Amino acid sequence: MKKVIDCLKENNPVIQKKLREVSVEEGMEIARELFEILSERKDGIGLAANQIGYDAAVAVVNVREPLILINPVIKEQWDEIDYYEGCLSYPKKGVHTKRYKNVVIHTEQEESDWYFSGTEISTEGKGTWEEQNKKQDQELRILESVCVQHEIDHLNGISCIDKAVDTTIRRTEKKWGRNEIVGITDGKDYKEIKYKKAKPLLDSGKWEIYIGGPIT
C-alpha cells in the first residue's frame, strides 16, 4: 500500500500539478486505496490522489459520510469564512485560510450536482441539548464543505499552505473577556481554557486562537 508523501521531507513531483482526468472505473479503484490509507492512519478526513503520488483527479472525503470525488469541478461557492486547517502532506503546519460555507460541485460519476452547506438548519427542538446538537451538526457541515474545497484544491495543484492568509490584524480586532472560554492551538495540540489563562500562551507566540478545521 502506498503512503502519504511528507512534502517537508520528500519530493512529491505531482503535489503542485493540475492532475489528469480519469475514467470512473480508474477513479473508483484509486478511491478505494485512498480510503484504505485513511482508515489505517486514522488521523485525516480527506485525501487526494497526488498526496500519495498519483497523477489522477481523484479524492475522497469522510466527514459525515464517505464521498468519492472523480474529476470534481466547483461550480458555485459563497459565504466566505475564516478557517484553520492542516494537511497530511505538510504535518504540523496548520494555517489560517479563507474558505466558503457553501459550495456546489460536479463529479464524473454523478449526473446531478452535489451541494455542501454549513448553513444552520432550523429544527423544532428547544433547550440546551437541542441547541448543542444543532451547533455540532452545523460545525460538521462546515467541516465537510471546507474539506471538499481542500481536496479539490489538491487536484489543481494547490495546497492549504498556498492559501495561507496573514491573521495578525484579524486576531487583534477581537476582544476577549478574561473569563471567556477560548480554543487555542500550537499546530498540534488543542485546548479550551479561560482567556486569562490562555493569554500567556498566546503572548509566547507558540499558541494562537483556534478557528477550527480539517487535517486532510
Regions found by a protein language model. Give the residues of each.
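Positively charged
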Residues: 1-181, 185-192, 196-206, 211-216
